Design a protein with these regions (language model features):
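A compositional/biophysical signature of low hydrophobicity enriched in polar/charged and small residues
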Residues: 1-172
Length: 172
């Protein structure tokens, strides 16, 4: 299998720049509560508001902070059916894999896509309202891609942990 960044620039590997203790406090605080005002954040990390704001902007520009969003409860918005899908593709030349990656990135039902080692080439996380919608996604979208050779679906019975903050202890 050819290993390279995903088809979208969004996922390109960024060079690692040094984070100091204050930067680590800022990203930990924002990860815990992305709605903090700059004044609240500055107070939490021990800075005045102006330097705090500059640091946040730098962390955003350097790619440490990708964005801010509300985390929705899937079941409350009618997306209570989650499937983890292992996909094998035909051939592993860059152009074949890129076609698959570009197609999957455009599918709104796919909330995560990973290039993996092991039995599958890719592992997708798919969310839909119910089983019939997954069947429609599978037959009407995923299996219509000529590069897809095999699909193995694993239906989530219960979610014990999802959307957890990233562990940042190694940065300190």
């Amino acid at each position: 299998m050819v290993i390279r960044p995903l088809a979208t620039e969004k996922y390109a590997v960024m060079p690692k720049t040094a984070l100091d203790v204050i930067d680590c406090r800022i990203i930990a605080a924002l990860q815990a509560n992305g709605r903090l005002s700059n004044i609240e954040l500055a107070e939490l990390v021990g800075l005045s508001p102006s330097p705090c704001s500059r640091r946040v902007k730098r962390l955003e520009q350097d790619g440490y902070i990708e964005g801010y969003r509300a985390v929705l409860r899937r079941d409350r918005v009618g997306l209570g059916f989650s499937v983890f899908v292992g996909v094998k593709i035909n051939g592993h030349a860059n152009e074949h894999a890129l076609l698959f990656e570009r197609a999957v990135v455009e599918m709104p039902e796919v909330v995560a896509c990973h290039l993996v080692s092991g039995e599958a080439d890719y592992f997708l996380e798919v969310v839909v309202p119910e089983l019939a919608d997954y069947q429609q996604f599978l037959v009407g979208k995923l299996l219509t891609l000529p590069i897809v050779r095999e699909v193995r679906s694993n239906i989530a019975i219960q979610t014990l942990k999802a959307g957890a903050p990233l562990p940042l202890d190694h940065l300190q």
